[in-house]
Amino acid sequence: MLDAAIIAIVTAACFFDLRTRRIPNALTFGAALAGFAFATAMNGLSGLGMSLAGWAVAVALFLPFFLLRGMGAGDVKLVGAIGAWLGPAGALVTAFFTAVAGGVLALVVVLARGYFAESMRNLWAILMHWRVFGLRPVPDMTLQSSRGPRLAYAVPIAAGALVTLWIR
């Protein structure tokens, strides 16, 4: 049941993210609530506690990227929903494999689209901005203002979740 639910969630998220570049709140919130309910049904209040902890760990790991305007809110809510199903340890493993998959996908996309040199210049500018001003959003470099290729980050999130299911 758990594997099937996560596969359904990430499949739907990828479908929406690839088509519309958005992940619906109904999907992310509904998936999180279903994860809380499933954990409670399986293990009572301790299950609910682990589910809430999984949601919190996942959101805490990805929220900074949203606050720095490098990731959409739907992506954060999606990893939170996955964390609600997998608990805190599963959320950590999923976050790791999501980061790996996201890095590989980003590299493939920038190389395929001839954007590598500009992306390295942008990365340098962001790092210098953070060095001078601290970890704050770079006003001219947000998801909304970017001219570069965009990633449907539900895809690496799905990859991270599926690898987590596979190795556990």
What feature does the model see in each segment?
Residues 1-168:
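A membrane-topology feature that recognizes alpha-helical transmembrane segments
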